[in-house]
Design a protein with these regions (language model features):
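Short, conserved beta-strand element in jelly-roll/cupin
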Residues: 119-143, 182-183, 211-215
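Short, solvent-exposed loop/turn segments at secondary-structure junctions
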Residues: 18-20, 98-103, 114, 139-141, ...
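Extracellular structured ligand-interaction cores
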Residues: 93, 129-133, 141, 178-180, ...
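A short secondary-structure junction signal
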Residues: 105-111, 118-121, 143-150, 155-159, ...
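Double-stranded beta-helix
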Residues: 139-196
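Non-heme Fe(II)/2-oxoglutarate
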Residues: 27, 42, 188, 194-251
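Active-site glycine-rich loop that binds ribose-phosphate moieties when present
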Residues: 113-122, 166-169, 173-174
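Non-heme Fe(II)-dependent double-stranded beta-helix
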Residues: 2-9, 15-121, 231
C-alpha cells in the first residue's frame, strides 16, 4: 500500500491514534527513563537540551520496561502505518522530545541530515533513502511545524538562509511555507526526517519519536546494538519485522 499523503506532503497525521490506556504504561516507563537521563545529563539539560535518545537501551530501563517499549513499537496498528511508507521498514532509534529549561530558548528549522551531510549531500539525500519519525504525543503540546513537500525538493533561498542562519536570517524565524500541526496526547504524526521542520516548545511538551528507515547500510550505521531486542523479546512482539530487518543487517 502506498501512502499517497506522505508521498505528496512528507507527513501524515492521525488524531487520537492511541487511547489514554495505551499511553499510560508507556508514559510511566518513559518518565522513569527521563528522570534518570536528566540526573545524568544535568549541565546539558539545564543549558540547551530539547531531546534525548536510545530509550530502548538497557542504560536506564530494565528488561520488563524495555519489552513494554518494544511491544508498543512493534504493534500491528503502528506497523501498518509504517509499512504504508517503507517496504521493508527497519527500526532505527527512539528519541524523547521535551521543553528546554530556559523558556527564552528558541526553536530552529532544520533537516535531520544537515548535521552529518554537506549541502550537496543533503540535496542528493532527497532522492533516498527515506527516514521517518513516528511522533507520539504523550501530552498536549504546541506540536511541530513542517514545510510540506520539502522531503522531495530543495530549499528556496529564504528557507536555506533561515535554517542555516545566514544573510541576516535566523533559524528561529517564521517561514511562510511552514504548516503547524498542533498535537494532543495520543495523536500520531509521521513525517520525513529529510523535510524542513521545527519543534514548537510550550505546554507540557513530551513526545516519543520512533524512527524507521529503509535498510541501507549507511543509514543503519547509526543503529546502536544495545537498543535492539533480544531473541527472546523478539518472539513476544506482535510485528517484529522492522526489528528483524535491522538485526539482519547488524550481523
Amino acid at each position: 500500500m502506498i501512502n499517497t499523503q506522505f508521498e505528496q506532503h512528507g507527513f501524515f497525521y492521525i488524531k487520537g491514534f492511541y487511547t489514554a490506556r495505551e499511553l499510560a504504561q508507556v508514559h510511566e516507563v518513559i518518565n522513569c527513563f527521563h528522570t534518570q537521563w536528566i540526573a545524568d545529563n544535568q549541565q546539558f539539560y539545564q543549558t540547551k537540551a530539547v531531546n534525548s535518545a536510545y530509550l530502548t537501551a538497557n542504560t536506564y530501563l530494565d528488561d520488563a520496561q524495555r519489552l513494554l517499549l518494544f511491544k508498543f513499537i512493534a504493534s500491528h496498528k503502528l506497523m501498518a502505518q509504517v509499512d504504508s511508507i517503507l517496504d521493508p521498514a527497519a527500526f532505527m532509534n527512539t528519541q524523547l522530545f521535551f521543553n528546554p529549561v530556559n523558556p527564552e530558548q528558541e526553536n530552529y528549522w532544520h533537516r535531520d541530515m544537515q548535521y552529518h551531510l554537506s549541502l550537496l549531500e543533503q540535496q542528493a539525500a532527497l532522492s533516498g533513502p527515506e527516514v521517518i519519525h513516528c511522533r507520539v504525543a504523550l501530552e498536549d503540546e504546541p506540536g511541530i511545524e513542517l514545510v510540506p513537500g520539502s522531503h522531495r525538493r530543495w530549499d528556496t533561498p529564504v528557507e536555506l538562509a533561515t535554517r542555516l542562519s545566514e544573510n541576516g536570517h535566523h533559524s528561529s524565524d517564521d517561514l511562510a511555507s511552514g504548516q503547524v500541526i498542533e498535537m494532543q496526547a495520543g495523536d500520531l504524526l509521521i513525517f520525513s526526517a529529510n523535510m524542513i521542520h521545527r519543534g514548537l516548545y510550550g505546554k507540557d511538551r513530551l513526545a516519543l519519536d520512533i524512527l524507521f528507515c529503509e535498510p541501507e547500510p549507511h543509514v543503519l550505521h547509526f543503529v546502536q546494538d544495545i537498543c535492539l531486542p533480544s531473541a527472546k523479546m523478539l518472539s513476544r512482539l506482535e510485528d517484529a519485522s522492522a526489528f528483524a530487518v535491522t538485526l539482519a543487517h547488524q550481523e
